[in-house]
């Protein structure tokens, strides 16, 4: 589990094809002295398992599933990545609960300066829009962010200079694809509201205003 508070801005050192999958090597200035084989490190929001490491790098294998569901398939040597080691019981919980399981790929649509901060708009796939809420949390390329406003599937974000400087956010431009992970609490709430009906659905939620009213959640 992670918090979405980025510890290092790393970069892709190499991308190798291994039997149809991919092996990544990531350069980082993280302290790697406490890393062990099999540890998890979030890389642009993707939970990767360490298979090898050194003082300033780590390597991980990536499955075809991850390549298809994340932006990882477009990474090349030199690509900047946000890096966070898995949290410890003693870690300050400064962000929100992040699993490292990417839900969808979004697209940056607007980038502009807003006083000293940066203003962004991100288009999220329609299927995850139901899990988003104004002032709620979302993980974008591994960064825990607060949704300022929401218009359908378009969410707006404001970032302070500190966050932009310590992450890959400074490289975001209109058209850039980003990894999105919704707040896991939204998924648990959906499951609780649906009850046994959740097991019957495969791809689409049937939560609606009438459903909430019928079950006593709206008056």
Residue ranges of model-derived segments:
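Conserved loop->alpha-helix
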Residues: 1-219
């Amino acid at each position: 589990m992670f918090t979405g508070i980025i510890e290092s801005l790393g970069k892709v050192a190499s991308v190798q094809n291994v039997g149809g999958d991919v092996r990544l090597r990531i350069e980082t200035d993280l302290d790697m002295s406490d890393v062990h084989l099999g540890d998890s490190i979030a890389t642009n929001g993707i939970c990767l398992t360490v298979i090898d490491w050194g003082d300033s790098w780590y390597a991980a294998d990536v499955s075809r599933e991850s390549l298809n569901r994340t932006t990882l398939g477009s990474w090349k040597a030199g690509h900047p990545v946000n890096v966070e080691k898995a949290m410890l019981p003693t870690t300050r919980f400064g962000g929100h609960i992040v699993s490292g399981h990417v839900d969808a790929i979004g697209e940056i649509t607007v980038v502009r300066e807003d006083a000293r901060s940066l203003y962004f708009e991100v288009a999220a796939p329609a299927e995850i829009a139901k899990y988003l809420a104004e002032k709620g949390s979302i993980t974008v390329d591994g960064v825990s962010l607060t949704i300022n406003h929401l218009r359908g599937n378009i969410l707006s974000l404001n970032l302070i200079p500190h966050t932009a400087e310590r992450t890959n956010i400074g490289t975001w431009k209109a058209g850039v694809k980003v990894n999105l992970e919704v707040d896991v609490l939204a998924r648990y709430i959906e499951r609780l509201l649906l009850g046994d009906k959740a097991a019957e659905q495969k791809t689409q939620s049937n939560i609606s205003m009438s459903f909430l009213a019928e079950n006593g959640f709206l008056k």
